[in-house]
C-alpha cells in the first residue's frame, strides 16, 4: 500500500493505518534524530514526538511532498530545536559549552562503537570509521550536521532536502559542500561519500 493511500485512510478515521506508516519509517527517523541530537534516549523521545506531532497535523497535510519527506521535516526540526535548547541549558561559559559538545560527541562515538562490536557483518576498521563519523558529526554546527545526515547518510536528494529544511536549493548545495569539507577535516581526508552512505544504512 502506498504512503498516500495510508494517509488518506488515516484522514478518513482509520487510525490503524498510521501504525503502518510508523512501522515503515520509525527506524530511519530515529537514526536521523540520533545523528542530529547526539543522545540515544533523547532520540527515542524525539522520534515519538515527531510521529505524534505528524499525526496531529495530518489533517493539514497537503501531500505536495511525500509523507516520508514530511515526517523527516518534523523530526529534523524537533531535533535541531532540542539540540539548541540543550546547548543553552548546558552553556555556562564558552569553555563549558565546548566541553559539553566534546563529551556528547565522545558518548555518541562510544555507543556506536559498542553497537558495531555486536554486528558480525562490520569489521573492526569499518566499526572505527563508523564511530569516528558519529563523533565528528556532533562537532559540526547544526546546519552542516543536518544536511550531511539527510544527504550522505539518509540519501535524500537535493530537492527533498530543500523541502525538509525549507531552504533554497542553492543553499542546500553550498551548505553540503562546506559540511563535507568540515566533516572530512574532523575525521580523515580519505573518507568518501560512499562510506558515509554505507554507515547510514548499509546500502548505496
Regions found by a protein language model. Give the residues of each.
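Structural recognition of an alpha-helix C-terminal capping motif at a helix-to-coil junction
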Residues: 45-52, 65-77
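Arg/Lys-rich amphipathic alpha helix in sigma70-family domain 2
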Residues: 59-63, 73-94, 126, 178, ...
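Sigma70-family region 2
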Residues: 11-12, 35-38, 51-66, 85-87
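Short, charged helix-capping/linker segments at alpha-helix termini
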Residues: 11-20, 30-49, 169
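Amphipathic, Lys/Arg- and hydrophobic-enriched alpha-helical face
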Residues: 22-40, 57, 137, 182, ...
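N-terminal module of bacterial RNA polymerase sigma factors
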Residues: 1-28, 113, 121, 138, ...
